[in-house]
Every structure is written in C-alpha cells, then in structure tokens.
Amino acid sequence: MRLSLDSFRAGLHPGSTYRVAFSGGLDSAVLLDLMCQVRRVSGIGVRAIHVHHGIQPEADAWSRHCAAVADRYGVALDILQIDGRSRPGDSPEAAARTARYHSLEASLDPGDILVTAQHLDDQAETLLLQLLRGAGLAGLAAMPNAVPFGAGILHRPLLRFGRRDILAYAQERGLSWIEDPSNRDERYDRNFIRRRILPQLAGRWPAVAANLTRSAGHCAEAAGLLDRLADTLMAAATAADEPGTLVLEIVQRLQPDEQRLLLRRWIHKRGLRAPPAKLLERIRKEVVETAGDRTPMIAWAEGTVRRYRHRLHLLPPSADFDASWTAAWSGETPLTLAGNGCLHAALCPGPGIDPDKWRSGRITVRYRRAGDRLEPAGRRGHHELKKLFQEAGLPPWLRDRQPIVCIDGRIASVGGSQWLASEFAGAPERVNIVVHWTP
Ligand SMILES: Nc1ncnc2c1ncn2[C@@H]1O[C@H](COP(=O)(O)OP(=O)(O)OP(=O)(O)O)[C@@H](O)[C@H]1O
C-alpha cells in the first residue's frame, strides 16, 4: 500500500497522546515525520523516546542525531539510558531488545500510545523466524497491531506498509536518518533472513511479505480465540476456595489438547514462561493423568507444578530459601526471612504467646528439624510437627517453610501463630503476642 498521510491516518489507533519510539533509523524517522504531520492537522500530543543502549560506540552520536531531529520538529525527546549488555550465554540482540522494551514500557503514562515503526517486511521476517523456531500459534501470530503495554498501549501503525514504500516516502520528504552497521551483520538470524532469504523468495513470489503477514493475521485471530477458550476452561477448573489452584478431577475430564491449552494458559497467567512442549506433555501425563493418590511434581526453570490432595498447584521458583537458616529476633521490628516473606509480632486480644514469657526469654527463629514436637495449646500431649501439618492438610512443600519461633530454644509458635505451644500460650481471653507470617 502506498504510504501517505491519509493512508497512514486511516489505520492509526485512536488516542490523544502518542510517544514515538525513535531509534534515528529510516523506519522510525518516517514514523516521527508522519506523527508530526498528524499532529499538525489534528492537534494530538506527540513526544519522542530514544533508548540509549550504551553498547555500540556510536550510541552517543545516535542520541545527538535524534535530539537534533526532534528539535527540528519541535517535539520533546526523552532519552532513556539503559544497560543493554547481555549476560554470558544470552543473545546480545535479544538482551538489548528485552531491556529496551522494559524501559519503554516503564516510561508510559496511563493512556499513552507508544508507536513503533515495524513494517510489513519486518512482520514477514518475524513469522519466518518463528516458524524456524517451531513456534506455536501465539508465536506465529508475530507482532500485533496494538496491545496493552505498561500503563498504555503499544501500537505499530506501519505494519501495513512495505520497506520500499517507507523508503520512497522518506526520499520524497527529504528525511535524514542513520544506518546501524549491525543491520548488515548476517550472523544475526533476522539480518540473514532479510538479506538472503526473503529476496530469493520474492524473486519467485513477489507478494511473499504480504502473504506471510496475512498468515500471521490468521494465526493471531486463531490464537485470540484459543485464549478465550483457555480462559473458559480455567474458570471451570479453578478451585473456588483457592484461586490459582486447579481441581484435578475437572482437568482430568478434559481431552489431552484441552489439558495442554489449559496448562499453558494457567502458567502464562501466573506471569511464568511455559515449559517447552515435551516438558508440558510430561506434566500432563505424570502429574495430571497419573492414577491414584500420588503426589507427583515437575519443575522447570520458571516454576514447579505439583499435585496434592486432588488439586494442582503452581509455584514460582524459590531460589534463595535456605532451610538451615536461623536468626535471633528482638521481636520489636519485623524480621525478614530470606526468600520466605517476613515475620512481625504485635499485641492483640485472643490466642497468642504470653507477653511476660515473650519479654523475658531469648527469641530465635528457625525452620523444622527432624523430630520437632509440640504440645498444641488447648490439647493434651506432644505431637510431631509432621503429624500436625498432615492433620491440617498443609501441602508437603510448605512444611519446611513454616517459620518456627523459639523462646530460650524451645518451640513457642509455628507458621506465625497457626500452632501455639501450650507452655508459652497466654490465656486466650487476654491480650497476647501474636506472630504474623507474611509468606
Ligand atoms: N534505540 C531505540 N530507541 C527507541 N526506539 C527504538 C530503538 N530501537 C528500536 N526502536 C523502535 O523499535 C522499532 C523496531 O526496531 P528494530 O526492528 O531494530 O527492533 P527489533 O530488535 O527487531 O525488535 P522488534 O522485534 O520489536 O522489531 C523501531 O522501528 C523503533 O520504533
């Protein structure tokens, strides 16, 4: 489609404040020019944002170029300084991109529309890259035209226009831009596809970019439908008294493909990246489908799926929890438990620790040790903590994480004030020390 002010405006997502992601390259130079023209005719607010990655030696010169261009348009430019370096083993391209998107996302105010300059050929490259990675529908949907992003929206108004139309527009308008030398580096997959593969395909199928983009559109529609189906399955399977937990029996009644869809959505909604397909299938077979009363679990880098008492639980990783940790506590100020929330103590009416015993003893906090026993307040006889936890239906993976408050080395309370030792418990009708645990 020919790129003109009218054809561009016709597809622009409605809004009143736009932030142009301006790298200084050809595509975003055209986008900024178009947005400034729209501003002239319709009075929208336009600001530009440039991300300074601090990686390439030219980064300072690019920032200066962007500032000069923005100045000529009379547009305010925010320069976001980020550390776009990758960690060993990560792709530098992906690390810079992730850091850039995070900083752009955080910079938006409510209602802002962030516009970026990806076009039809970028979309075709993205689809090919996703196919080569073996992506599922969500990946093949490639880049959406508009999605919620931070406090605002991310919108790509040039997706309908090809690289050639964008170049023609820039030349016609006499725009200036900078060329990033790394765009020619064919060690990067995207550059290889753009420079070697797509021209070959276009020699035989001139409409290749438009057709691939159309396929991405079909995938996007199907992916949206499946998301809605997954939400319906999840609403039906979620335990009413424990949001975030699924009722095993309901999940088991679904077909295998529905189970996979539901598991992926459940993990995604928790903000975790789904495991690879093979591992997801193991979760389905070994955790969901296994018969009997077993309590299987499967962990991957992003989390753990566990089955316990007819429910499925999803836990984020807990890297810094140390079961051998112990500390003295004044009881006056909250105590932070590494990787396990915090404790605080307050005087409250009702069951709790006798304030006199609390003040006169030496308080320490630790975790469970083999053979720990307790006589619960109001009950006769000592019981192993393990038995008390089982009796209360506490899932096994939470048992070692219950903080144990000791007075002079003897257990006074467990899990905040969930279990109180009779030897330290105050009279329940009086005001006592209540230990709260916020995991
Ligand atoms: N340094 C930058 N500062 C501000 N915006 C940028 C910067 N780099 C890129 N952008 C914005 O992102 C768009 C896409 O850039 P580019 O194609 O280089 O990114 P990419 O790494 O391939 O990411 P994507 O997959 O989103 O296209 C640009 O057109 C521009 O709008």
Curated annotation (Swiss-Prot):
SUPFAM superfamilies: Adenine nucleotide alpha hydrolases-like, MesJ substrate recognition domain-like, PheT/TilS domain. Its EC number is 6.3.4.19. InterPro entries: Lysidine-tRNA-synth_C, Rossmann-like_a/b/a_fold, TilS/TtcA_N, tRNA_Ile_lys_synt, tRNA_Ile_lys_synt_N, tRNA_Ile_lys_synt_subst-bd. Its main location: cytoplasm. GO terms for cellular component: cytoplasm. It is found in: Cytoplasm. Keywords: ATP-binding, Cytoplasm, Ligase, Nucleotide-binding, tRNA processing. One of its GO terms (molecular function) is ATP binding. ATP binds at S23, G24, G25, L26, D27, S28. It holds the Pfam family ATP_bind_3. GO terms for biological process: tRNA modification. It catalyses: cytidine(34) in tRNA(Ile2) + L-lysine + ATP = lysidine(34) in tRNA(Ile2) + AMP + diphosphate + H(+). Ligates lysine onto the cytidine present at position 34 of the AUA codon-specific tRNA(Ile) that contains the anticodon CAU, in an ATP-dependent manner. Cytidine is converted to lysidine, thus changing the amino acid specificity of the tRNA from methionine to isoleucine. HAMAP family: tRNA_Ile_lys_synt (MF_01161). The N-terminal region contains the highly conserved SGGXDS motif, predicted to be a P-loop motif involved in ATP binding. Belongs to the tRNA(Ile)-lysidine synthase family. This is tRNA(Ile)-lysidine synthase. The lineage of its organism: Bacteria, Pseudomonadati, Pseudomonadota, Gammaproteobacteria, Methylococcales. The gene is tilS.
